[in-house]
From Swiss-Prot:
UniProt: ATP binding residues: 170-177
Species whose genome carries this gene: Helicobacter pylori (strain G27)
Cited SUPFAM superfamilies: C-terminal domain of alpha and beta subunits of F1 ATP synthase (SSF47917), N-terminal domain of alpha and beta subunits of F1 ATP synthase (SSF50615), P-loop containing nucleoside triphosphate hydrolases (SSF52540)
Compartment(s) of residence: Cell inner membrane
Protein name per UniProt: ATP synthase subunit alpha
Membrane topology: Peripheral membrane protein
One Pfam family recorded for the sequence: ATP-synt_ab
Family label: Belongs to the ATPase alpha/beta chains family.
Gene name per UniProt: atpA
Keywords, in A-Z order: ATP synthesis, ATP-binding, Cell inner membrane, Cell membrane, CF(1), Hydrogen ion transport, Ion transport, Membrane, Nucleotide-binding, Translocase, Transport
EC number(s) recorded for this UniProt protein: 7.1.2.2
Site label Required for activity, positions: 363
Any one of the GO CC terms: proton-transporting ATP synthase complex
Chief location bin: membrane
């Protein structure tokens, strides 16, 4: 056996000492003082940032919401069943991030951006902070491109443009979610990525929405974020911010996105719950003073960017539920003042068979004609006024029976226009078909058709056009306007169809 030389031993030891690295992990650690209702009070984290992600030794995570002199109020994701007094909490020195990009499209995620659809992990290296500054004035461009919903009453009377924030407001069970889902279904082939954020909804309702989107092939370009009623208030509060971060990725990469928040009433309630547990002073309706700010900073992130920034857009459709039609409550008035218009859905209209139950008088788009193609403007120019006069006459006829001819004519035309604007759920209509049927109603082609048969007239008109005169629809689609020749051709087609149509 060969003896080890002294020099060899010393050189090996020297080499080991030279290459030795002390593998220690430096972390700022605090202790939980108290934990209740999803909020932990933590002592010993003096350098923590506002809304920094913190890790508990139990594996739970949370964000630092209240930074006090001697403690930190931490909102815990999930229910934190194993967190108790004395549990260690360490800083991550990073703010809340979610996965973004094409990898999330077609998936159902929770508020933290984790998949909950059983289709495996999201493979992406791209993450984005959920709290971002909204684009400034100079980075924006005025809304000028239409975002068609496929709903006649909206595209003709309260048009939505790319980059707009349009509120959908109404009592429960008036078809608010259906309007939003129709808008998502209608984006097929339009190169618009859609994000549906469900806040405080029943799991069964969200599953139904996902099934509908899959049925109409809309999941291919959609993301669903679910913070259901069974999730903690923290998850419900975070969900819309995670959703908008995903939408911003497409906006900032010169693409177009549409985000639906369903609904912000429940979001405000979740935030109220968190704030009261954090012992922040309550204000009107027990909401904290900054409840306006949580919604304004969320909705301001929807924008149409200027050409220098890539001309991308993020359109927001927030939904708010009212109680007994009271739009003057705290949260509805807040969000009405933040958004660029509202679509008001009414219970009375819904139960009288007018669906979508849009109250044309109270609904408004502050973008207006800028978000419409010229053809729609041409056919629906006086539609709002005509419907308003019809409603006035209708109220008058309840007291007076004898009407002059002009009033009778106006009343009959109005009844037919109300029928024209009716639409079945999940059946959005291409803009060229909308132009044709609204033109037919506005120009008196439906005057001889009985009111009950207007919907049937429309159902037969579209296949007739597709079979015999597809060029009419194609021309409206490409020209986006009705010139003299096209209008003459459209009149001829409608007259021909009226001869063949039998009630």
């Amino acid at each position: 056996m060969s003896q080890l030389k002294l020099e060899e031993i010393s050189s090996v030891i020297e080499e080991k000492i030279k290459n030795f690295e002390l593998d220690c992990d430096m972390a700022e650690v605090g202790k939980v003082v108290s934990y209740a209702d999803g909020v932990a009070k933590v002592y010993g984290l003096n350098g923590v940032m506002s809304y920094e992600v913190l890790e508990f030794e139990t594996g739970d995570k949370g964000v630092a919401a209240n930074l006090e002199e001697d403690s930190v109020g931490v909102i815990v994701f999930g229910f934190g069943n194993n967190i108790k007094e004395g549990t260690s909490v360490k800083r991550t020195k990073s703010l809340m991030k979610v996965p973004v990009g094409d990898a999330v499209v077609g998936r159902v995620l929770n508020a933290l951006g984790e998949p909950i659809d059983g289709k495996g992990e999201i493979e992406t290296n791209e993450f984005s902070l959920i709290e971002q500054k909204a684009p400034g004035i100079m980075d924006r461009k005025s809304v000028h491109e239409p975002l068609q919903t496929g709903i006649k009453a909206i595209d003709a009377l309260v048009p939505i443009g790319r980059g707009q924030r349009e509120l959908i407001i109404g009592d429960k069970q008036t078809g608010k979610t259906t309007v939003a889902i129709d808008a998502i279904i209608n984006q097929k082939g339009q190169n618009v990525i859609c994000i549906y954020v469900a806040i405080g909804q029943k799991e069964s309702t969200v599953a139904q929405v996902v099934r509908k989107l899959e049925e109409y092939g809309a999941m291919e370009y959609s993301v669903v974020i679910n913070a259901s009623a069974s999730d903690s208030a923290a998850m419900q509060y975070l969900a819309p911010y995670s959703g908008v971060a995903m939408g911003e990725y497409f906006r900032d990469h010169a693409r177009h996105a549409l985000i639906v928040y369903d609904d912000l009433s429940k979001h405000a309630v979740a935030y109220r719950e968190i704030s009261l547990i954090l012992r922040r002073p309550p204000g009107r309706e027990a909401f904290p003073g900054d409840v306006f700010y949580i919604h304004s900073r969320l909705l301001e992130r929807a924008a149409k960017l200027c050409d220098e920034k890539g001309a991308g857009s993020l359109t927001a459709l927030p939904i708010v539920e009212t109680q007994a039609g009271d739009v003057s409550a705290y949260i509805p008035t807040n969000i009405i003042s933040i958004t660029d218009g509202q679509i008001f859905l009414e219970t009375d209209l819904f139960y009288s068979g007018i669906r979508p139950a849009i109250n044309v008088g109270l609904s408004v788009s502050r973008v207006g004609g800028a978000a419409q193609i010229k053809a729609t403007k041409q056919v629906s120019g006086t539609l709002r006024l005509d419907l308003a006069q019809y409603r006035e006459l209708q109220a008058f006829t309840q007291f007076a029976s004898d009407l002059d001819e002009a009033s009778k004519k106006q009343l009959e035309r109005g009844q037919r226009m109300v029928e024209v604007l009716k639409q079945a759920p999940y059946s959005p209509l291409p803009i060229e078909k909308q132009v044709v049927i609204i033109y037919a109603g506005a120009k008196g082609f439906l005057d001889s058709v009985s009111v009950k048969k207007v919907v049937d007239f429309e159902e037969q008109l579209h296949p007739f056009l597709e079979a015999k005169y597809p060029q009419v629809l194609e021309e409206i689609h490409t020209k986006k306007a009705l010139d003299k020749d096209l209008e003459a051709m459209l009149r001829k087609v409608l007259e021909e169809f009226k001869l063949t149509y039998s009630e």
